[in-house]
Design a protein with these regions (language model features):
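The feature captures the beta-strand-to-loop junction immediately N-terminal to the Walker
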Residues: 48-50
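Conserved ABC transporter NBD signature motif
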Residues: 71-79
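A short, proline-enriched helix->beta-strand linker immediately N-terminal to the Walker B motif
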Residues: 164-168
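Catalytic Walker B motif of ABC-type/P-loop ATPase nucleotide-binding domains
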Residues: 170-173
Length: 227
């Protein structure tokens, strides 16, 4: 008797025909115009484009922080768009890591406590904190507070927090924007290492180095996407 093949795992991140409008008085801005993308495990997708092209808006919609006016976003097969905030927060906690130019660290908690906080919200098996800190070269800084970290350490600590819940998808918005070239190269090496663990990574950036490191590049111009 033939054994049925196991079903394929769901796509880590899929967005279809995203539209997002912003209104200010009588003026209306179309920030996203029919943007679609599919990001598989191990992909590193760079989202490029000039300031105001829709990069941050796209990442906010992908993370479920902002709801598109049209279209749908699925993470690990679950629809995150057009859901209650409680449902979106639950999906984010389980499947999404977020990394921004300003590190996503609680100032009153040390590095280890920041990781523990994220892991407590994940409700799923998480990356072992000592292993994660060791991978990022922070094993001797776990008791340090954000204001005690250098710029490079702060970037790595932000990445550690973003990876603490073993995310299916990592979304990064200008993560290297304020770093010198050497530190930027190190952070990019770490992001590539993350893809080797099977994580789908999307990075919005102006940096040519980020685009060069990506497996695919999505360029936004006035909210329109071009691969």
């Amino acid at each position: 008797m033939a054994v049925a093949a196991a079903p394929a795992p769901p796509c880590p991140l899929e967005a279809r025909s995203l539209y997002r409008f912003y209104r200010a008085g009588d003026e209306e801005t179309l920030a996203l115009q029919g943007v679609s993308l599919r990001v598989e495990s191990g992909d590193l997708v760079a989202v490029t484009g000039p300031s105001g092209s829709g990069k941050s808006t796209l990442l906010s919609c992908l993370a479920g922080m902002d709801d598109p006016d049209g279209g749908i976003v699925r993470i690990a097969g679950q629809r995150i768009s057009h859901r209650t905030e409680r449902d979106r927060a639950r999906i984010r906690a389980r499947h999404v890591g977020m990394l921004f130019q300003s590190a996503n660290l609680a100032e009153h908690l040390n590095v280890a406590q920041n990781l523990a906080l994220v892991q407590s919200l994940a409700a799923r098996p998480s990356t072992d904190a000592p292993d994660l800190l060791g991978m990022l070269g922070l094993q001797d800084r776990c008791g340090a507070y954000p204001n005690q970290l250098s710029g490079g350490e702060l970037a790595r600590a932000g990445l550690a927090v973003a990876l603490a819940n073993s995310p299916t998808v990592l979304l990064a918005d200008e993560p290297t924007g304020e770093l010198d070239s050497a530190t930027e190269a190190h952070v990019l090496d770490l992001l590539i290492a993350v893809t080797h663990r099977g994580t789908a990574v999307v990075v919005a950036s102006h940096s040519s180095a980020v685009a060069a490191a990506a497996t695919r590049v999505l360029r936004l111009d006035d909210g329109k996407a071009r691969w």
